[in-house]
Amino acid sequence: VSAKHLLPEIKPAPPHGHWVRFLPHEEPVLVQKGHWIGFDLDGTLSRTDNPGHFEPPYPIGEPFAEMLAVVSALKEAGVQVKIFTARACEPSNVPLVKAWARKHGLGELEVTHQKDYDLLRFYDDRAIQVSWPGTMITAPVKSQRL
């Protein structure tokens, strides 16, 4: 499966940061130094169909190569990336998530469960984007089965 349509187009904008076109149909966005892009872990960076995923010790699934390519492209350009996951609510899970990221070639990434005003964009398999002013709502890319 080709992930070329997912790869961001990135151009340096020294000394401020980088211009990033996240998707081909979007306008470029200035990602300033200090701003960060968040990626959910379960269902976004990693699969959730592995045996025992929803049972203790909650093993992290295999990666989605396409999403790892997006993270890698942003990191290589100097854009700050963090893994944003509910797993980080338990401090003992943070080293496990970091080890998973290293194992799959992402290097050192901050792992958090807290948003702040520097979060510029968030990739999540369950999110619905609401944009104001107006009433534009963007549905999630994939649906969840009951």
Feature map (PLM): residue ranges:
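HAD-like aspartate-dependent phosphatase fold
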Residues: 2-146
